Structures are given as C-alpha cells and as structure tokens.
Amino acid sequence: FTIDLPAELKGVHMSRLVESMTEEISNQFRVHPSIEELQIKILEGLAQKHPFSRGEIKFEFEFGYTTRTPVSNKRTWEVCNVTAITRKENETPYIHEVEIEVIGNTVCPHCMANNDGLTHIQRAIGKLSVIGETAAVPKYGSMIDVIEKSFSSKTYSLLKLEDEMLVTKQMHENPLLVEDVCRNILQLAKEAFSDRDLEMFAEARSLESIHKHDVIAQGRLVTNGY
C-alpha cells in the first residue's frame, strides 16, 4: 500500500490499510474477474476508512498456467512472475500497471554464422509491462503468449527426450539476439493489443552462457486503440 497523508493527520492509520485489504480478500462470497478489479475494491474500501487523494496498491506473485509438451503431449505446469499495480488519484480513472516475466532462450546468430553452425545457447528472461485503464489491460495469458513467441523457442518445465530434440531443433532454426527478442515482444504486443490505449515496455535479458555478464535490451511503444 502507498497513500498520501492529508495535512491534518499526524500519521497514517496502519490498521485501516490492512483491514481494508483483509476484508476484501477474505470475502469468500465475492468473485473478482481480475486482480485489477480486486485491487480497485481494496482501494475503494480503504477510501471509506482512511482519507487520501492518491493511493497505490501493489501485488507481486507467481502465476501458474498449464501447457502441453510439443511432441509427447504431456501436460505441464509453468510459472511466471507477475507484478500488478493499481493507482488512484483524486477523480481520475484507475490506472493499472502489469508486468509479466517469462523464461525462454536465445541462440547467438552471429557465432552460428561464423562458426560452421556451432553457437552458444542460454536461458533468457522476457518482460512485458502494460500501463492503462481497467478495460484496456490484457488478459495475463495473452501477455504470456506474446513473450513466449518472442524467443528462439519456448521452454518447458517438463520435457521428454523427443521434446528436447524438437526444442533444440527449433532453437537452432530461429537464432536470435537479445535485441531481437525485445523487438519481437513489442511487435507482437502491438499486433495483439493495437485496439487498446496502452503504454507498453519490453525487456529481454540473456543469461549469457560463455560470457561473465548478462545482456539486456529494452524498448517502449504506445498504442492508441485505432
């Protein structure tokens, strides 16, 4: 929680912050269509208990989803990191910021082109952040799909040998620099969410396997819903 403190108050009412969040989360008879809607309800509840003109609530959590391995068709659970922030200032609309972080991989095309097809591969981390009003925020699954498609290949928690063989083949058929991954995230996000008013940020981090450093690329774009 972050709120501004009215001038007439000496300090914040700490218990009211916790109380407003606990009441909303503990209400088992209320179903929220999204994390963002839950955060709105918490801030609305807090506004009834504690005066503020600007408030912010932030959740950091792991988001689990299922997929199928590419050859053996085994069901596997994947997990990605999510940061969700909702802000409210005076009478302006609620603004949300959602960041999703997904693990994939990169294959160095420069080394491959100059080394008879031999190259280094490594895990990579892709991030997509979106900022917008409630109706504009995409579903988490669609954001995950954008990031996963931006790597040399998807990665999986569970892989049988036949899956490993295909993933390795796909990686080497699609060598990408970390800058390519970042550009892919932004391009695919633009195509997927062009009908929404969003500010979007992308980051790709390559956990270099033969270097003693990581490589990071970042980018930004804005869609205007038309």
Question: Would you name each region that the model predicts?
Answer:
Residues F1-Y226:
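N-terminal intrinsically disordered, cationic/polar leader segments
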